[in-house]
Design a protein with these regions (language model features):
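Short, exposed beta-strand-loop hairpins at the edges of beta-sheets
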Residues: 81, 91-118
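Central antiparallel beta-sheet cores of small beta-barrel/beta-sandwich binding domains
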Residues: 23-89
Length: 123
């Protein structure tokens, strides 16, 4: 009986953390760039994102996606906008107000750069 209870509890906790990770799905406005984007799961079940205006894929999930319950964040993704010279390695924090905060680094020949973006859910 005790084993069944433990298994049931583990299953419920897994479902709750999965639901939290899926909080990134939907249509968002990137405040800093003024772009409307959609984050979705592709046919392979991986997270991806596209710019609504031209369907440019700007966000791709890296191989080993991890969800940190304590920080309420998903890591790692590759982010690249058409106007950028290089891509960014980023993670996504799900904020308490439901918005998303993206932070990451990009490496070039001359140094390392940091980016921060704020996404607001669109209805």
């Amino acid at each position: 009986m005790k084993k069944i209870l433990v298994l049931l509890l583990m299953l419920i906790l897994g479902i709750v953390s999965y639901a939290k990770a899926d909080d990134v799905l939907g249509t968002w406005l990137i405040k800093e760039k003024g772009k409307i984007v959609e984050i979705y799961k592709n046919k392979a079940g991986e997270y991806a994102g596209k710019i609504k205006k031209d369907n440019f894929i700007f966000l791709k999930q890296n191989n080993d996606l991890t969800y940190d319950k304590e920080r309420n964040s998903l890591a790692y993704f590759t982010l690249k906008f058409p106007e950028d010279r290089f891509s960014w390695s980023i993670w996504i924090n799900i904020e308490k107000d439901g918005s998303l905060f993206i932070k990451g680094t990009g490496n070039t020949e001359v140094g390392k750069y940091i980016t921060e973006l704020h996404l607001i859910r669109q209805k």
